[in-house]
């Protein structure tokens, strides 16, 4: 069951290791090895998931609508696995091609952002029902807001990012309200 979360766990561990090692003034090659190792572990576990077919992860009773509980279900099936495999392959391709550009100025913070987006992108791929998709997509929107507000962009774009996030949250809440109205009818 928790095998489904292993690629996400490997990527989150890679993010933490990159953040810690980058503070120690390590060489770029060391940081690249950490990044590539995390990408390889993610790729390997997603490949293994195809053959192991772990059970879905269900968070029962996540929200109550009247007397009806709404469950969140995450996992891989024959269709979603393909998208997760494609995402892991893109990450691995980016990691391997970074080796060519190591002599250029590298910013490990950008690698952390890439890994964070892959983690946040795997959750919507794993969603097996509408409410799971809404929750996962909201998490992805939150990651995007954090990156825009963290100082990588000018203040004008920060305001635009906050407004876009507010509109997305409004859309998510409208979808949740419509879904809850459907359950009560």
Describe the role of every protein-language-model region.
Residues 24-26, 112-116, 120-181, 185:
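Alpha-helical multi-pass transmembrane bundles of energy-transducing inner-membrane proteins
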